[in-house]
């Protein structure tokens, strides 16, 4: 994560009126279903729009699904410390969160929702501190996760095992998050997450 002066950091925080809600989870945890439910609950939530260096697909539009940058533009913005977090998933294929875009949403009073990998989630929580709530969604067990991924019927066995290995790594980050939601019952997990977020948003 980039280093900013204390003055700039405090000034930036002072200008913000919205809050941040960060979600991370292993694939197959039910995170996306929970997030989509929360977006219907009149909490003034707005999804963070990521930047990427991949080309648009189909009807995707710049500034709607993603901010589309060339690899050169992305690297230039990295050098200028414009990202809260970013990842190069493979050569010249970047994804990241632009600080300027998040601050625009916060200044509008929106509560910004992030769906990030564990490292990106921890970085944003560290940057924004108490203004951010970090939530880790996890399955009740690795065996249950394996059953869910197998039940999808979309991945080959070797792909599933790679996802399981990644999940085991990601779950080691759970203690770094403010709250851990164990999704062994989807409706209960949705209700628990909603209450956690309401409590957070109502805090001064």
From Swiss-Prot:
One Pfam family recorded for the sequence: Guanylate_kin
Gene Ontology cellular component list: cytosol
NCBIfam families per record: guanyl_kin
Family matches, as InterPro entries: GK/Ca_channel_bsu (IPR008145), Guanylate_kin-like_dom (IPR008144), Guanylate_kinase (IPR017665), Guanylate_kinase_CS (IPR020590), P-loop_NTPase (IPR027417)
Similarity section: Belongs to the guanylate kinase family.
Classification lineage: Bacteria, Pseudomonadati, Bacteroidota, Bacteroidia, Bacteroidales
Compartments it resides in: Cytoplasm
ATP-binding recorded as keyword: yes
Main location (coarse class): cytoplasm
Keyword field: ATP-binding, Cytoplasm, Kinase, Nucleotide-binding, Transferase
Record-listed E.C. numbers: 2.7.4.8
Enzymatic class: transferase
HAMAP family xref list: Guanylate_kinase
Functional note: Essential for recycling GMP and indirectly, cGMP.
Positions of ATP binding: 25-32
PROSITE patterns assigned: GUANYLATE_KINASE_1 (PS00856), GUANYLATE_KINASE_2 (PS50052)
Protein origin, superkingdom: Bacteria
Protein's UniProt name: Guanylate kinase
Gene3D superfamilies in UniProt: Guanylate Kinase phosphate binding domain (3.30.63.10), P-loop containing nucleotide triphosphate hydrolases (3.40.50.300)
Reaction(s) catalysed by this chain's protein: GMP + ATP = GDP + ADP
Record domain Guanylate kinase-like: where: 18-198
A molecular-function term among this protein's GO annotations: ATP binding
